[in-house]
Amino acid sequence: MGDSVVLDPLDVWRLSQGLHLSVDQLLAGKIELGVTDGNILPHLRMTGAEERCVYLNSNGRCSIHSFRPGFCRLFPLGRYYEDGSFKYILQIHECKKTSRSKIKVRKWVDTPDFQNYEKFVCDWHYFLLDVQAVLYESEDSDLIRNLNMYVVNQFYRKPYDEKRDFYEQFYAVSYTHLRAHETAANL
């Protein structure tokens, strides 16, 4: 699996809350930073020759199932992004299970406040594409490093208040930064 389970800010927030660990404590052993499409983003650490998720127990079962990342919640579904939105797709060759039953995506993904979750997922995806465009257009290594670390620090490492709604906090941070990004792009 390698670094294929890329984490978004909600995933890291859920892991931090569920495991009662700070983001820095998670980065010290359970998650790692890696480059994904030019962006430096956290992903679940994999171990051993088989590159197994650190959260799989000895029986191969997920030990963080109730607060597992969105990528894990989605599998074997995927998302196809187009025109500022996305559609769910079924990756039929990814799942070994042969007896499949119909289930609503909302139930499968099993996340509270599904409408806000889908908005967040879409907004985060397109924000990263905007960041990626800046990274690919620049040859300034300092700008590339600083922009990547800015995203990591502002959206992952900066603590979210566990007593407040995640989405409210995310959009308070992202709105400010997205507006600054748009202003800079128009200069």
What is each model feature region?
Residues M1-V134, K158-P159:
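Hydrophobic scaffolds flanking metal-cofactor catalytic centers in soluble metalloenzymes
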Residues F170:
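Nucleic-acid 5′ end/cap handling module spanning
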Residues L143-V151:
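Long, charge-rich alpha-helical interaction segments
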Residues T176-A185:
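Conserved small/polar residues in nucleotide/adenosyl-binding loops
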Residues F155-R164:
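Terminal transmembrane helix and immediately flanking juxtamembrane interfaces
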